[in-house]
A protein has these predicted regions:
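Preference for long, amphipathic alpha-helical scaffolds in soluble/luminal domains
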Residues: 1-325
């Protein structure tokens, strides 16, 4: 990690990048004047204020596919990635809207539209699946709500849904026989990513049998990428492309989540994954998106022609966590 690239991040016009760089790469305390200034500028930034407004309009519209990058659920997770707090302007109302819909099991619910050909009604209904509820849980935990009783119950419920080979496609009991594609006994790679990301923020569950099983599922998938492909989730050229926000199953998302667990840092499978990312840096140590979500056009991480400060920060943080930077 060179001084030049760090300075480039600190001179970025992205206050969220400056804020996280100071905290995560330079270990500045929260009360550091530069940290506080960057944070204030982040919250005042028009793009961030738009994210907050879209989150506050929860549920926005019924979710039909979980890789819909423009859905408000991914505005929540991006605000969490940036470092928003539950008390930040606009977020209390958004959080209240999320907590207003919880299942009897404790899971946070999303307004979902399941097509009739998949056993749904074709209309919006409040329910949960393991490919949406962990993302909401991640956001609320990141916002600092780990002591909230509803949030703790949601975390415990998520941990309880683990199976012997990782998290599988599990949905609310009210959805009957509905489940996602693939073999019933197979783990779902993206569910394991979402679940691990959420539970990494739970003081009681971050290092638990559930998280260790989920981590092994993802590392095993990387190791066996040529021998086995989980339905919809191959590890090929597209998987290796740097992409943000963290919506779907790709290398930066997976490595960022795995890197949250210290017991992974020396695993050769993880380090090989990180090396695949670092090989994509340019001569100045900067990273450029190789793929993008059109719904996020206008953000640096959705520009395939110019290096992105935020993508560069994410890559450097992964390296720093495991001592490879």
């Amino acid at each position: 990690m060179t001084t030049d690239v760090i300075q480039w991040l600190l001179e970025s016009r992205e206050p969220w990048t400056r804020y996280r760089t100071l905290l995560d790469l330079l270990d500045r305390p929260d009360d550091d004047p530069q940290v506080q200034t960057a944070r204030a500028e982040m919250l005042a930034h028009p793009q961030v204020q738009t994210l907050v407004s879209e989150a506050a309009a929860w549920p926005g519209y019924a979710l039909k596919r979980h890789n819909d990058a423009k859905h408000p659920i991914h505005k929540f997770s991006t605000l969490a990635d940036f470092g928003a707090y539950a008390t930040d302007p606009g977020l209390p109302a958004a959080i209240e809207a999320v907590l207003a819909h919880r299942s009897p099991e404790g899971a946070l619910q999303t307004l979902v539209n399941i097509h009739q050909r998949y056993g749904g009604t074709g209309e919006g209904m409040w329910t949960w699946m393991l490919c949406d509820t962990p993302t909401l849980l991640y956001a609320l935990l990141s916002f600092g709500l780990d002591d909230d009783e509803c949030v703790r119950r949601a975390a415990n419920h998520l941990a309880s849904t683990i199976d012997e080979n990782g998290w599988r496609c599990v949905v609310a009991p009210g959805l009957g026989k509905f489940r996602g594609p693939g073999r019933k006994a197979d783990p779902c790679p993206i569910v394991n990513v979402y679940a691990l990301k959420a539970l990494s923020l739970s003081p009681d569950l971050a290092d638990s049998p559930a998280t260790r099983t989920g981590v092994e599922m993802l590392l095993g998938h990387w190791k066996d990428q040529k021998e086995r492909k989980h339905y919809l989730f191959g590890i090929g050229t597209d998987f290796r492309k740097l992409k943000y926000p963290f919506v779907w199953y790709d290398i930066l998302h997976v490595a960022d989540v795995l890197g949250r667990f210290s017991f992974v840092h020396t695993d050769p499978r993880f380090r090989e994954m990180v090396a695949t990312i670092t090989a994509q840096a340019d001569e100045d140590g900067r990273y450029t998106a190789a793929s993008m979500y059109r719904a996020w056009k206008g953000w640096s991480f959705a520009d395939k022609k110019q290096p992105s400060p935020w993508l560069t920060f994410l890559a450097l943080r992964i390296q720093r966590r495991c001592g490879m930077g």
